[in-house]
Structure formats: C-alpha cells, structure tokens
Amino acid sequence: MLGFARLVAHALAAFGLVGLLMTGFDYFSNVTGIPFLMFTINPNTNVIHLVTGLVGIEMTGRADLARRYLLLVGAMGLPWAVVGYVVEGTMADFFGRNPALVHFHLGVSLVALLLVLWRRWPVLPPTQPTADPVDGGSI
C-alpha cells in the first residue's frame, strides 16, 4: 500500500508539473484542453494533479498517513471520475477531460479505495494461561 501511495503521489506531481509547463496559465478554463500523452489537459487539471501529488509526497512518509492519502485520493477521485463521464464533451466540462483521463482517474481511485478498505486480519498466536495478577496463581 505504501508503495502504491508513493507511486500515485509522485506520478500526479510530475503529471501536474509537466502539464503546467506545457499549458502555462493561459486559457485557464479551456473546455477543450490540449493533448498530453493520451490525455487532454488544461491548467485546472494540472493544478489539481500537482497539489494532490505534492500533498501525497508529504503524506507518504508514514504508513498511517499514506493510508489516509489513499483514502482521500479514492474518496475524491471516484466522484470526480463519475462526473467526468457525465459531463465529458459538454460545455459544462471546464476541466477539458477526455475518456482516457476519466478512465485513469477511475482506475486510480478504485485501486486506492480497494487498498484502504482491504482488511488484513492479524493472525494471533494461541493464548497461554497466565498467572493471575491478584494472587499470583495460575488460571
């Protein structure tokens, strides 16, 4: 889980930074976006990816914070992806997303939530009778 959290954080930060270098802050809410790899991006999505990645880089130093980071990525990314499917290609999509970017958000969100919600029950060793703390005798 920690490795996936670090991978997501670094990938989002790099994606956001390179995207901002490509788009700058011109046409901040361009509904069409510009092509980047197989995605379309605009400054809105780049800033969101960069901030999410930088927060994640800071949070993935500890396992408990990495788990919270993945919970945030999943809890925020899942509705983000669903809305992306609904408004994709319309003028309401001021993030300029395309289906590939929406699929990416959905996949990362689902894997993040799966890792957070997956319960690994600890295997407890069999208990041995212990001394009674009151009288010092055995149980």
Regions found by a protein language model. Name each.
Residues 1-139:
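Membrane-interface extramembranous regions
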